Amino acid sequence: MMDYAGRVREADTYPKLLRLNAREHGSEIALREKDLGLWKPFTWNDYQTRVRNFALGMVELGLARGDVIGIIGDNRPDWVAAEIATHAIGGLSLGLYRDVLDEEAAYLLNYGEAKLVFAEDEEQVDKLLGLADRVPALKHIVYSDARGLRKYDDPRLMSAEQLVEMGRERQQREPALYDRLVDATKGEDVAILCTTSGTTSHPKLAMLAAGRVLRHCAIYLAFDPKGPEDEYVSVLPLP
């Protein structure tokens, strides 16, 4: 049986763990996404490359350690890639439900001083553009689904593929940069801002260190082991 606790000691952040899995299982399937009725596979190498390009693209935009990056949309590979890429540059990820009300989205993004938001599609882009004046720190909006957005010309907008291309170019100029960024991540550093229920007032942002979450996962897996032959279906919203 795998030594889960030892693996977490070796890779105590999500970017480190992804890099380790890509090295050991690069050509194996890590994720699948259903698109037009067909399951599209992504290998661990695909996954790692997407994360690296997102991370270096954000570095190219001037984002750095301590910056808050918002993510809003459905469960999809780009959500996970955006979150791990955020951690890779030392940023803090802030996930929002795709049906979040405008008032709550504005409050949370402003409270977290989010500088960039990954948005799934036109619906989320419209929501963010409508809130822009209330979230002054927001400088960039990256969308994954370009349908309906061709005629949008707001300077804050860019597609996920444009961000990927920026990251790819940065990788060519500095091939060792991404590994240096990942090596600098620490399990005790806050990586995730998780919204509380907000039953009595505005939601608060609970601060989670990635290392603690991964250690919890290791304890769980020690009692209910999982391996390469097991598959999960992502149903509950990712925030």
Question: Where are each of the predicted segments found?
Answer:
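Flexible, non-catalytic linker and terminal segments flanking ANL/adenylate-forming cores
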Residues: 1-14
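AMP-dependent adenylate-forming
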Residues: 17-42, 148-149
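Conserved pre-ATP/AMP-binding loop-to-beta segment of ANL
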Residues: 27-29, 158-195, 202, 225-231
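Conserved AMP-binding/adenylate-forming core of the ANL superfamily
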Residues: 30-84, 101-106, 159-164, 208-211
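Conserved AMP-binding A3 loop
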Residues: 41-45, 183, 191-215
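Conserved structural elements of the adenylate-forming
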Residues: 51-52, 206-227
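Structural core segment of the AMP-binding/adenylate-forming
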Residues: 61, 88-166
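Conserved AMP-binding
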Residues: 73-76, 97, 235-239
